[in-house]
């Protein structure tokens, strides 16, 4: 977890309500300060640094994109403007084009009113807490002392529509075959993948039906996408396809639906692809990196299939940090952020979709069969407002109650009590074989936390 107390940056960049808390003025300043920090080590003194900029389909995206680009140009940085494109495509193109940094304007799976700014370093990875802290220090200085070049010292912006095709060609190379004859349903969340789905999946030979591919600036994630898979499940059943694939607003997540309309979440996708890689001898250390929020059914399925797991804090950045630190090549989150480190530096919904379809084609198995070993346990999460979340988490009575519940579970269930990273909340999460037991155990622990809450 971060040792820095960050004011603007959260776990996934700078986010807020567009034109309210995330204003064009702030975006301009982020362009100046972020640009200065990220390009200070640019190698060629005779050439201006280059930053690439993409966005999702939100109505505020153009406004914020223009503002941050103006900030970059004002400190002498050239910009390649990608237009509407996915977040993982920006990460890929930073490396492919040897740019000094990348920026995506997006709020991922959030509603249309929100937006955000994600930075990538020249290695294609999200920024470290240290770099974010340095940007914030510059942002909060009382006077802007950064360079203000003029004439030919200013940056220049150019459109780069070829970026999309480069990214799609890269994706196709991650599987060694086409997908001829596969029948699928695709949900673009009215977001960044909307214009890419038909191009990619037609080239690979699939037959497909789509929804959520008509963005109007306001309908991103609205009743569609990876956080709203019910519409896709209906489309799958109506059209008798082999699988449904739902992406989020910026294309870094995937939630699948099997041929029966049942949800295949990130845990199941990690198991399916991990088992396939392991059987091929390609899963490093026979292990998958996941967060503490992955379901106990996922962990049991891994163990029953000769694999192990490494747990991290919640957030795909922490998954990636662990993957780099311990040299693993598969990791992700229940929410559908899946990282294939052999190919990518961040979660990528389209890349994950291709790997999942490839496993289906190679094994000849239905998606429901591949997911069957993962028996998802019922889960309940309760958020309790407390005066001091750290103190309550370590209260002897709370610890004793957790131990009592865990003893009753006898290994067939799980308790996770953790503080919120941003709010005065203690989160109590319980998984057990039945919903009745989940309710019983959750309330048992939550009642003790409430008694000790100090409120």
Curated annotation (Swiss-Prot):
- Active site residues according to the UniProt entry: 108
Read off the InterPro entries from this record. Answer: A-D-PHexomutase_a/b/a-I, A-D-PHexomutase_a/b/a-I/II/III, A-D-PHexomutase_a/b/a-II, A-D-PHexomutase_a/b/a-III, A-D-PHexomutase_C, A-D-PHexomutase_C_sf, A-D-PHexomutase_CS, Alpha-D-phosphohexomutase_SF
Q: Needs which cofactor?
A: Mg(2+)
Give the EC number(s) under which this enzyme is classified.
5.4.2.10
Give the UniProt keywords, A-Z: Isomerase, Magnesium, Metal-binding, Phosphoprotein
Q: PTM details? A: Activated by phosphorylation.
Among its keywords, does the record have Zinc?
no
Give the reaction(s) catalysed: alpha-D-glucosamine 1-phosphate = D-glucosamine 6-phosphate
According to the UniProt record, one GO cellular component term is: cytosol
Output the GO biological process annotations, alphabetical, semicolon-separated: carbohydrate metabolic process; peptidoglycan biosynthetic process; UDP-N-acetylglucosamine biosynthetic process
Family to which the UniProt record says this protein belongs: Belongs to the phosphohexose mutase family.
* Free-text function comment from the UniProt entry: Catalyzes the conversion of glucosamine-6-phosphate to glucosamine-1-phosphate.
Protein's name in the database: Phosphoglucosamine mutase
User: Per the UniProt entry, what species is this protein from, by scientific name?
Assistant: Leuconostoc mesenteroides subsp. mesenteroides (strain ATCC 8293 / DSM 20343 / BCRC 11652 / CCM 1803 / JCM 6124 / NCDO 523 / NBRC 100496 / NCIMB 8023 / NCTC 12954 / NRRL B-1118 / 37Y)
């Amino acid at each position: 977890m971060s040792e820095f107390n960050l004011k603007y940056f959260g776990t996934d960049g700078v986010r807020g309500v567009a034109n309210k808390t995330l204003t064009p003025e702030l975006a301009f300043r982020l362009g100046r300060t972020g640009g200065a920090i990220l390009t200070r080590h640019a190698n060629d003194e005779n050439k201006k640094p280059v930053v690439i900029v993409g966005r999702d389909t939100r109505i505020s995206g153009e406004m914020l994109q223009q503002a941050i680009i103006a900030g970059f140009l004002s400190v002498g940085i050239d910009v390649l403007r990608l237009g509407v494109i996915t977040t993982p495509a920006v990460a890929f193109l930073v490396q492919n084009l040897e740019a000094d940094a990348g920026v995506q304007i997006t709020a991922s799976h959030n509603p249309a009113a929100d937006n955000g700014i994600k930075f990538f370093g020249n290695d294609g990875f999200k920024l470290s807490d240290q770099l974010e802290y340095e940007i914030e220090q510059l942002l909060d200085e009382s006077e802007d002392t950064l360079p203000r070049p003029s004439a030919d010292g200013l940056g220049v912006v150019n459109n780069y529509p070829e970026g999309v095709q480069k990214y799609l060609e890269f994706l196709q190379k991650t599987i060694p075959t086409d997908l001829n004859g596969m029948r699928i349903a695709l949900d673009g969340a009215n977001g960044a993948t909307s214009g890419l789905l038909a191009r990619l999946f037609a080239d690979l030979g699939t037959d497909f039906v789509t929804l959520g591919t008509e963005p109007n600036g306001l309908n991103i994630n609205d009743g569609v996408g990876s956080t709203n898979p019910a519409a896709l499940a209906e489309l799958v059943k109506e059209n008798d396809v082999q699988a449904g694939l739902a992406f989020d607003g910026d294309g870094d997540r995937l939630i699948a639906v099997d041929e029966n309309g049942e949800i295949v979440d990130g845990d199941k996708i990690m198991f399916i692809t991990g088992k396939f890689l392991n059987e091929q001898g390609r899963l490093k250390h026979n292990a998958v990196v996941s967060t503490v929020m992955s379901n106990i059914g996922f962990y049991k399925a891994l163990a029953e299939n000769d694999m192990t797991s490494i747990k991290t804090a919640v957030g795909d950045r922490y998954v990636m940090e662990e993957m780099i630190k311990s040299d693993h090549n598969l990791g992700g989150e229940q929410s559908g952020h899946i990282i294939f480190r052999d190919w990518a530096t961040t979660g990528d919904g389209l890349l994950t979709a291709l790997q999942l379809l490839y496993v289906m084609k190679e094994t000849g198995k239905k998606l429901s069969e591949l997911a069957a070993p993962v028996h998802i346990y019922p889960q309940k999460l309760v958020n309790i407002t407390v005066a001091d979340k750290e103190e309550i988490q370590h209260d002897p009575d709370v610890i004793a109650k957790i131990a009592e519940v865990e003893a009753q579970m006898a290994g067939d269930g799980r308790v996770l009590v953790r503080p919120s990273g941003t709010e005065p909340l203690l989160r109590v999460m319980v998984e057990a074989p039945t919903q009745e037991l989940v309710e019983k155990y959750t309330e048992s622990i939550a009642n003790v936390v409430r008694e000790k809450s100090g409120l």
